[in-house]
UniProtKB/Swiss-Prot annotation:
GO CC annotation: neuron projection
UniProt cross-references to InterPro entries, sorted A to Z: ACT-like_dom_sf, ACT_dom, ArAA_hydroxylase, ArAA_hydroxylase_Fe/CU_BS, ArAA_hydroxylase_sf, Aro-AA_hydroxylase_C_sf, Aromatic-AA_hydroxylase_C, Trp_5_mOase
Family as reported in the entry's similarity comment: Belongs to the biopterin-dependent aromatic amino acid hydroxylase family.
Claim: Iron is one of the keywords in the record: yes
Species of the source: Xenopus laevis
Transmembrane segments: none
Gene: tph1
Enzyme Commission number, as recorded: 1.14.16.4
Protein's recorded name: Tryptophan 5-hydroxylase
MF terms (GO), sorted A to Z: iron ion binding; tryptophan 5-monooxygenase activity
Record PROSITE patterns: ACT, BH4_AAA_HYDROXYL_1, BH4_AAA_HYDROXYL_2
CDD domains, alphabetized: ACT_TPH, eu_TrpOH
Domain ACT: from-to ranges: 56-131
Keyword terms: Iron, Metal-binding, Monooxygenase, Oxidoreductase, Serotonin biosynthesis
Length: 481
C-alpha cells in the first residue's frame, strides 16, 4: 500500500487502539528502548546520502514483546533517519498490529531494509523516496514505443507485405488487375498521416459484389451465432455508416462513428503489421484497418484480413465500451514490453478478439472477429464439434495460432469484464521498469517512473472521487437520506 505523506498528512492514532495483547506500557517501553534509532550525523552517513527523500514503510508484527525494537533496529543499522512512527490495529489479524514509519532514505537503503524486514514480518508495503526515479540504465533496455498518437506515423507503415506482393498460392496472384488494385489501396494507406481524413474510395463493381456476398451470407448466421453486443451495434452501423449489401462503408464514416461511441478511430494500413506495431495502435484506441477487398474468385474465404473482415468482424464490437476498453488494455500492456511478452499478448489477443467465445444466457456465442467474418468457421465454432476451454491467459498465451485452417481450440469467457480482469492480472506479470497511464485529453501515455508522476495520478484520482462523492451527496439529498 503506497502512501504519499506530503500530499496527505496522516493523523496519528493513540496506542490505546492497539490490540490489547500488547498493553500501552509495553508498547511505550519498546519505543523508549528505540530512541537510539535516530542517526547522528557522521562522516560515513554523510558520504552515503544520495538521492534521499521521504519514504513510507508499513509492516505488521506478531504479538510478541521486543518485536518492534528488533524491526526498528534494522533502520539504525542501515543509517536511516526515522521521521515519524505510529501504530494501528491490524485489519488482517486481531493478534497483530501494524507499524507505520516515515523515514529519510535513498533507493538502495530502502531495498536493503525491505529484504531485511521480510523474514520478521507478516505484511510489508512501502512507498519509494519522494525524489525516486527509475534509473536511465533500466530505461535503455526498453524497446522503443509510441508515446503519443501521432507517433503511430513512425510504425504504421512497417508492413510485412506491401501492395501487389502476394504469395504464389493467393487467389489473386495471377490476376494483374487485382494486384494493381491492391497496390492502389496500399499507396493510399502509406500516404496517410495522423490527423488526415481517410480518403474516399470508389469501389469497383466486382468489389461491391464480393462484399455483398460475404455480407449476405454472414447476416444469415449472426442472429444465432453472434453475441448480443454485436447484434446491438450492427444495426447502428447500417444506420450511420451505410452497412448494406450493395455498399462498402467508407473508413472515414466508420472512424467518426467509433470516435463518438468509444473513442476508437480507424487508421488505414497497407497490410500485415508486426504484433508490436499493431498492439501499439490499440493503446491509443487506434485500429489499423485494411481497405482492400478479397479476390472475387473465392468470396467466402480469404488468406489475409481484408475490409470485409475488418468492417464486419471487428468494428461492431469496437463500438462497445467494455470491449473497446479490453482491446486498449492489451495494447497498453504491450508498450515497452519484451519481444516474448508482446508475443504472449498477441496470442491472447488472437484467441479473444479474433477467435473468442463467450457465454450468454447459458449458450455459447461468438465475439471473435475472425469467426464473425468467416462463414465456415463461424458454423464450426458452435457446432458442438469444436474443442473449447475456459479463457486463462497463462494457458492461452502458449496455444498455437493457426492461420491456414480452423483453430484446434477455442477459449470461452463468461463476459468481456471477466476477460478484462484476467488480462489485467496477466499484464502484471510483464516486466517493465515503469508504469503507464493513458491520457485521453492529450491522446498520449504518461510514463510513471518517479514519485512525482505517481503523485500527479493520485491527485487526478482524488479529483475524480470528489466528483463521484458530490454526485452521491446530491442523490442522497433528493432521496432524503
Amino acid at each position: 500500500m503506497y502512501s504519499n505523506r506530503k500530499e496527505c498528512p496522516r493523523r496519528v492514532k493513540s496506542f490505546d487502539s492497539v490490540n490489547s495483547g500488547l498493553d500501552e506500557n509495553q508498547i511505550n517501553n519498546e519505543f523508549n528502548k528505540s530512541t537510539y534509532i535516530k542517526i547522528e550525523d557522521n562522516k560515513e552517513y554523510s558520504e552515503n546520502v544520495c538521492e534521499r527523500g521521504k519514504a513510507s514503510v508499513i509492516f505488521s508484527l506478531k504479538n510478541e514483546i521486543g518485536g518492534l525494537v528488533k524491526a526498528l533496529k534494522l533502520f539504525q543499522e542501515k543509517h536511516v533517519n526515522l521521521i515519524h512512527i505510529e501504530s494501528r490495529k491490524s485489519k488482517r489479524r486481531n493478534s497483530e498490529f501494524e507499524i507505520f514509519v516515515d523515514c529519510d532514505s535513498n533507493r538502495e537503503q530502502l531495498n536493503e531494509i525491505f529484504q531485511l524486514l521480510k523474514p520478521h514480518v507478516n505484511v510489508i508495503s512501502m512507498s519509494p523516496p519522494e525524489n525516486f526515479t527509475v534509473q536511465e540504465d533500466d530505461m535503455e533496455s526498453v524497446p522503443w514505443f509510441p508515446k503519443k498518437i501521432s507517433d503511430l506515423d513512425k510504425c504504421a507503415n512497417r508492413v510485412l507485405m506491401y501492395g501487389s506482393d502476394l504469395d504464389a498460392d493467393h487467389p489473386g496472384f495471377k490476376d494483374n488487375v487485382y494486384r494493381k488494385r491492391r497496390k492502389y489501396f496500399a499507396d493510399v494507406a502509406m500516404s496517410y498521416k495522423y490527423g488526415d481524413p481517410i480518403p474516399h474510395i470508389e469501389f469497383t463493381e466486382e468489389e461491391i459484389q464480393t462484399w455483398g456476398t460475404v455480407f449476405r451470407e454472414l447476416n444469415k448466421l449472426y442472429p444465432t451465432h453472434a453475441c448480443r453486443e454485436y447484434l446491438k451495434n450492427l444495426p447502428l452501423l447500417s444506420k450511420h455508416c451505410g452497412y448494406r449489401e450493395d455498399n462498402i462503408p467508407q473508413l472515414e464514416d466508420v472512424s467518426r462513428f467509433l470516435r463518438e461511441r468509444t473513442g476508437f478511430t480507424i487508421r488505414p494500413v497497407a497490410g500485415y503489421l508486426s504484433p508490436r506495431d499493431f498492439l501499439a495502435g490499440l493503446a491509443f484506441r487506434v485500429f489499423h484497418c485494411t481497405q482492400y477487398v478479397r479476390h472475387d474468385s473465392d468470396p467466402l474465404n480469404t488468406p489475409e484480413p481484408d475490409t470485409c473482415h475488418e468492417l464486419l468482424g471487428h468494428v461492431p464490437l469496437l463500438a462497445e465500451p467494455s470491449f473497446a476498453q479490453f482491446s486498449q488494455e492489451i495494447g497498453l500492456a504491450s508498450l515497452g514490453a519484451s519481444d516474448e511478452a508482446v508475443q504472449k499478448l498477441a496470442t491472447c489477443y488472437f484467441f479473444t478478439v479474433e477467435f473468442g467465445l463467450c457465454k450468454q444466457e447459458g449458450k455459447l456465442k461468438v465475439y471473435g472477429a475472425g469467426l464473425l467474418s468467416s462463414i465456415s468457421e463461424l458454423k464450426h465454432s458452435l457446432s458442438g464439434n469444436a474443442k473449447v476451454k475456459p479463457f486463462d491467459p497463462m494457458v492461452t498465451c502458449n496455444q498455437e495460432c493457426i492461420i491456414t485452417s480452423f483453430q484446434e481450440l477455442y477459449f470461452v469467457s463468461e463476459s468481456f469484464e471477466e476477460a478484462k480482469e484476467k488480462m489485467r492480472e496477466f499484464a502484471k506479470t510483464i516486466q517493465r521498469p515503469f508504469g503507464l497511464k493513458y491520457n485521453p485529453f492529450t491522446q498520449s501515455v504518461d510514463i510513471l517512473k518517479d514519485t512525482k508522476s505517481i503523485a500527479m495520478v493520485v491527485r487526478e484520482l482524488r479529483h475524480e472521487l470528489d466528483i463521484v462523492n458530490d454526485a452521491l451527496n446530491k442523490m442522497n439529498k433528493q432521496l432524503g437520506v
